[in-house]
Amino acid sequence: MKECPYGEKCYRKNPIHFGEFSHAHLDAIYAKGNESGDYEIPANYSSEMIHTQLKLLEKLFPKQATNKEQEAHSSSSKPAVTAPVASGSSSSGSLDTNPSGSSASGPAASQDTSNLAKKQKLNAKNIRDYIPVVIEKGGMAKKLERAAPYNMFLTAITDSKPTHSEPLSITLQEILDESLGEIESTVQINFMVDIGWLLGHYYFAGILDKPLLLLYGDESPELLSIGKFKQQVTAIRVKMPTPFATSHTKMMFLGYSDGSMRVVISTANLYEDDWHNRTQGLWISPKLPALPVDADTGAGESLTGFKQDLMLYLVEYKISQLQPWIARIRNSDFSAINVFFLGSVPGGHREGSVRGHPWGHARLASLLAKHAAPIDDRIPVVCQSSSIGSLGANVQAWIQQDFVNSLKKDSTPVGKLRQMPPFKMIYPSYGNVAGSHDGMLGGGCLPYGKNTNDKQPWLKDYLQQWKSSDRFRSRAMPHIKSYTRFNLEDQSVYWFVLTSANLSKAAWGCFNKNSNIQPCLRIANYEAGVLFLPRFVTGEDTFPLGNNRDGVPAFPLPYDVPLTPYAPDDKPFLMDYLQG
């Protein structure tokens, strides 16, 4: 087993990581602990983080295992290849940095700056040693062209070979493919980032020396000082107003040497596990050319107002380093974009006279009420996400009163008596996870916990299993988040949302109801997604479902329909099953 390159600085809490990498400091603490799970954690470590990591070791390497098995976990000396290095290449540079950013001292630091660096250089040549699914370069432009009009992809699954050649499957290397344009600079906005893994991809794409602006959410020791070692990288942690809020958006901007750019909105974090055996979704914009210097201020907007909504969203970060990119977006032609930008930003928000509600589920309601074709009230609202928040004591508390009340909107004239549509929630069952490519570890991306689940037993009546045999992904647990309404009888999809937002009040917002004032939607997180509305994508009232219709491709749902409800003995997968 390879030694984690971050050593004592490792902050990961993902079981797959601990199944692949050893950690000498954790192994030493684990070996001294008793069978009751009591450990002496040195004062110089974060007690909470170390305890969580030890619980993962308990699950992966039970005490009843022989000492030899545990020693094998701790004594393996082969360090991980965090990112490859090529000497003498102007587009590569050196990646052998000390992840903590501190001065090298002692044996552990010495290993970080010498053994790891040497190992990286030895393994610099073969992309397949670093990236499990490698697609031939140069073909992404044609793949994107064939994906029109939806431009929506799922990530390739390492252990599902059919996805490697599926037309609507994609890898990170393909997103960076030169056939889409010669990249001169990029922006990555994401929650969790493994900078070594990301720069490895940049290395193989030949853009390691290009400027990268990285906005991240999850605390990351190696990102704190990456700029000292990689001057082309500017890493900024997004400051959140409350401790429980999350900068959860996953979005990329790719700037090309001809002045054009591209926007990618994703559900995947930027680390290996999320691009391995997990179902993720991405929307990729067309190429967005630069506008003429003398273009009008409002030129280059799409019919969906995507450009304005995106700029308003980016301004909310209040990060000066984004200003050149906001200016670049303003000076780019977004008219080819056929989807709506759908964002969430922290704070309290009220309806405006021009844009309606600006963020969260209320923004989605405004767009649906204006543009969605009339929908029969019997058509369910189908939700799907990789985590579930605290939703209240019953289905009425937030799901119906707030969330479904927004997602039921359409352009039916006001005044008609409407009913609350059915609510369905796709979330992997225990059996779904147990049968996944990674077994129980496949649930590492599903952080729904027992404490929350115990408070909302009513939810099980609405749960649907994860099934995706049509897309070869039934065994690839979903980290994708999607929301839609479709009619199986006439094989139609009314609208579809792909987003970073899980089913939670923090992501979508919760109304503070006060009869004396206009309701205020309180949102905790940054989130970003896209809304597909047929009138803007295909010119029809609905998308085809299952088969093409009059030359219009079927909408590529990420899961099988009809849905499969939980059986009486099914139960949702809970993260506690991994943590003991």
Swiss-Prot record:
<dbReference type="GO" id="GO:0003690">
    <property type="term" value="F:double-stranded DNA binding"/>
</dbReference>
<feature type="binding site">
    <location>
        <position position="250"/>
    </location>
    <ligand>
        <name>substrate</name>
    </ligand>
</feature>
<dbReference type="GO" id="GO:0005634">
    <property type="term" value="C:nucleus"/>
</dbReference>
<keyword id="KW-0677">Repeat</keyword>
<keyword id="KW-0234">DNA repair</keyword>
<protein>
    <recommendedName>
        <fullName>Tyrosyl-DNA phosphodiesterase 1</fullName>
        <ecNumber>3.1.4.-</ecNumber>
    </recommendedName>
</protein>
<keyword id="KW-0539">Nucleus</keyword>
<keyword id="KW-0269">Exonuclease</keyword>
<dbReference type="GO" id="GO:0006281">
    <property type="term" value="P:DNA repair"/>
</dbReference>
<dbReference type="GO" id="GO:0004527">
    <property type="term" value="F:exonuclease activity"/>
</dbReference>
<dbReference type="GO" id="GO:0003697">
    <property type="term" value="F:single-stranded DNA binding"/>
</dbReference>
<feature type="compositionally biased region" description="Low complexity">
    <location>
        <begin position="87"/>
        <end position="110"/>
    </location>
</feature>
<dbReference type="InterPro" id="IPR010347">
    <property type="entry name" value="Tdp1"/>
</dbReference>
<keyword id="KW-0963">Cytoplasm</keyword>
<feature type="binding site">
    <location>
        <position position="481"/>
    </location>
    <ligand>
        <name>substrate</name>
    </ligand>
</feature>
<dbReference type="GO" id="GO:0007417">
    <property type="term" value="P:central nervous system development"/>
</dbReference>
<keyword id="KW-0378">Hydrolase</keyword>
<feature type="active site" description="Proton donor/acceptor">
    <location>
        <position position="479"/>
    </location>
</feature>
<dbReference type="GO" id="GO:0005737">
    <property type="term" value="C:cytoplasm"/>
</dbReference>
<feature type="region of interest" description="Interaction with DNA">
    <location>
        <begin position="387"/>
        <end position="390"/>
    </location>
</feature>
<comment type="similarity">
    <text>Belongs to the tyrosyl-DNA phosphodiesterase family.</text>
</comment>
<keyword id="KW-0227">DNA damage</keyword>
<dbReference type="Pfam" id="PF06087">
    <property type="entry name" value="Tyr-DNA_phospho"/>
</dbReference>
<dbReference type="InterPro" id="IPR019406">
    <property type="entry name" value="APLF_PBZ"/>
</dbReference>
<dbReference type="Pfam" id="PF10283">
    <property type="entry name" value="zf-CCHH"/>
</dbReference>
<feature type="site" description="Interaction with DNA">
    <location>
        <position position="504"/>
    </location>
</feature>
<feature type="region of interest" description="Disordered">
    <location>
        <begin position="65"/>
        <end position="117"/>
    </location>
</feature>
<dbReference type="GO" id="GO:0017005">
    <property type="term" value="F:3'-tyrosyl-DNA phosphodiesterase activity"/>
</dbReference>
<comment type="function">
    <text>DNA repair enzyme that can remove a variety of covalent adducts from DNA through hydrolysis of a 3'-phosphodiester bond, giving rise to DNA with a free 3' phosphate. Catalyzes the hydrolysis of dead-end complexes between DNA and the topoisomerase I active site tyrosine residue. Hydrolyzes 3'-phosphoglycolates on protruding 3' ends on DNA double-strand breaks due to DNA damage by radiation and free radicals. Acts on blunt-ended double-strand DNA breaks and on single-stranded DNA.</text>
</comment>
<keyword id="KW-0540">Nuclease</keyword>
<dbReference type="GO" id="GO:0045197">
    <property type="term" value="P:establishment or maintenance of epithelial cell apical/basal polarity"/>
</dbReference>
<feature type="active site" description="Nucleophile">
    <location>
        <position position="248"/>
    </location>
</feature>
